């Protein structure tokens, strides 16, 4: 069973950073189903990544790896029951 989540991530203006984040997502067995740039400033770009992910372990690993990159991010919670697993994971992480 796959779950859908949206990650909002602020990426600094650095060559290769979008590729690095996309690779992190893929390495955790998640599929990017949509990317949207929502904000642009001189220092950063804000992207929304809609992802499909197979299980809680992969989601937890992905969030940990994003935190290790020192990126400002948040997970947008979906209100449908099938996304409730994401809410359980978020209780274990401090908000940025």
Predicted regions, residues:
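A conserved regulatory-domain signal marking ACT and ACT-like small-molecule sensing domains
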Residues: 1-96
């Amino acid at each position: 069973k796959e779950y859908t989540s949206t990650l909002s991530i602020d990426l600094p203006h650095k060559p290769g950073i979008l590729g690095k984040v996309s690779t992190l997502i893929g390495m955790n067995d998640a599929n990017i189903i949509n990317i949207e740039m929502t904000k642009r400033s001189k220092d950063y770009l804000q992207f929304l990544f809609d992802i499909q992910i197979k299980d809680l372990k992969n989601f937890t690993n992905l969030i940990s790896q994003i935190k290790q990159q020192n990126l400002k991010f948040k997970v947008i919670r979906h209100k449908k029951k099938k996304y409730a697993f994401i809410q359980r994971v978020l209780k274990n992480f401090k908000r940025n």
